[in-house]
Amino acid sequence: IKIIMNKGYFEIIRAGINTTFQDLGRKNLYHIGIPFSGAMDNRNFLLANKIVGNKLDLPVIEFAYQGPLLMFNGHKINIVITGDVIFKIRKKNNEIEGNCYETYQLEQGDEIDILSTNKSVYGYLAISGEFDLKFQWGSCSVNTKANIGSNEGKKLNNGQKINISKINSNLEKKKINYFNSKIENIR
């Protein structure tokens, strides 16, 4: 297996109930029939990108109730889960109970299993890098009713691959307290 250092992909083993790509969304297009879209929980969306060191408007994976089970294929990448979420990370000989708002480093073959949201409906998975997605009307956000956005406007499916076009090499460990965190640009 040839591993390219700054690229990789996630293989979706279980897609989850309602798993899509979301960013800040499309605004000011409703007058021409393009519906609003974007992350449902703006604070957790922004915090996810901030924790992994991304620009705040980069697309993330949004999931509701039960999230995906993903296997990472690539060199190394940092991920974070935000929201009130129960998840596990499976490494070669180890299973870790995950903590939200804390980065974890995934390596070739590691799995992240997002079991369920707890006291929230939505949760977010951000990576230290960028998903390889198609922009439509200035956004990657998926609106499944209108079938617009990346992934042809559809939810993610079992067996699908999520390509990562760029992985940040800065893999420092970060952790924040949700209640004491400050984030700018919240509505």
Region roles according to the model:
Residues 1-187:
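Conserved "landmark" site that anchors the functional core of diverse proteins
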